[in-house]
A protein has these predicted regions:
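Conserved active-site segments centered on acidic
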Residues: 1-71
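Alpha-helix C-terminal capping/helix-to-coil transition sites in glycosyltransferase folds
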Residues: 74-76
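Phosphate-binding/catalytic loops
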Residues: 85-147
Length: 147
């Protein structure tokens, strides 16, 4: 039996981007990929606009709770994806790290649900590419690996 690939999505608070990425991957890959999310400085709740923007796609993350990064999980997963510029993790031998410098519409004056939809769509495109890479046994995920 082949082991399922696994991914850990990390952002600072584990209330927005990493939760969105995990929700999108769960919907896209189903049980073909083990999906986890965590934060380097976890907040107390999922961002309401993040949940609303995924809800528009039929994905419910409102019951998720922010959790801290577990060093053992970082070592155990195949890929760690760091979303945004705030979260920092030291690379672990044997685990692939990817940095996703996600779109930040607020830098262009776009806020509220419109901002979150743009963030969601950027993350969704990246999640689709990662899901494709994880489902191809001979390929290795390779978007912006950390050296």
């Amino acid at each position: 039996m082949t082991r399922r690939p696994s991914v850990l999505f990390v952002c600072a608070k584990n209330g927005g981007k990493s939760q969105m990425a995990a929700g999108l991957m769960r919907q896209l890959a189903g049980d073909r990929v083990d999906v986890h999310s965590a934060g380097t400085k976890p907040g107390t709740a999922v961002n309401a606009l993040s949940a609303e923007s995924l809800g528009e796609l039929g994905i419910d993350i409102s019951d998720q709770t922010p959790k801290p990064v577990d060093p053992q999980l970082v070592a155990d997963v195949d890929v760690v994806v760091i979303l945004g510029r705030e979260a920092q993790l030291d690379p672990v031998p044997g685990t692939e790290f990817q940095n996703w410098d996600t779109d930040e519409p607020s830098e262009r004056g776009i806020d509220g649900i419109e901002r979150m939809r743009l963030v969601r769509d950027d993350i969704a495109a990246r999640v689709r590419r990662l899901a494709d890479q994880l489902s191809t046994p001979s390929s290795t995920p390779s978007e912006e690996p950390v050296q």
